[in-house]
């Protein structure tokens, strides 16, 4: 199954190169140059993973991650950074990121993380569906 990915970065050249490299690997990639546009896309579409730059002008990756978590807690988010530190990694994970990748991203490693995100999202969605069925059965005394 093809993974659907939203790639968010304010550096357009990086965005275009990464998107093309991901498409060559049969991923369906949508791109966005801002966190606010990404939030609109996430509200309207379904993605297996969001890969987002840690530092963007209007809203950073952590702020965007928190906004996404409020609306779509099942969304798998991988943050990208050009300045990886242990502190940034810890901050990203505490905020709810699935993972954290240093730029320039190793596409093999990133592809594996995206596959993992696809699987994790499917498990979460399945559990949510099961929880709804159980809730309905309990509601009607079954």
Residue map of PLM features:
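Two-component/phosphorelay signaling modules centered on CheY-like receiver
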Residues: 12-30
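Receiver (REC) domain active-site loop signature in two-component systems and cognate sites
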Residues: 56
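C-terminal output helix
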Residues: 105-115
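Helix N-cap/capping motif at the beta->alpha junctions
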Residues: 31-40, 61
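CheY-like receiver
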Residues: 119-142
């Amino acid at each position: 199954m093809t993974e659907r990915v939203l790639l968010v970065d304010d550096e357009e050249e990086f965005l275009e190169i990464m998107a093309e490299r991901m498409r060559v690997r049969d991923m369906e990639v949508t791109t966005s140059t801002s966190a606010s546009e990404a939030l609109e896309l996430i509200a309207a579409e379904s993605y297996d993973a969001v890969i987002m730059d840690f530092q963007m002008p209007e809203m950073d990756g952590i702020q965007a991650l928190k906004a996404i978590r409020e609306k779509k807690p099942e969304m798998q988010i991988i943050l990208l950074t050009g300045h990886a530190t242990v502190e940034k990694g810890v901050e990203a994970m505490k905020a709810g990121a699935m993972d954290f990748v240093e730029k320039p991203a190793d596409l093999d490693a990133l592809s594996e993380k995206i596959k993992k995100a696809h699987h994790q999202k499917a498990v979460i969605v399945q559990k949510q569906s099961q929880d709804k069925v159980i809730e309905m059965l309990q509601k009607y005394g079954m």
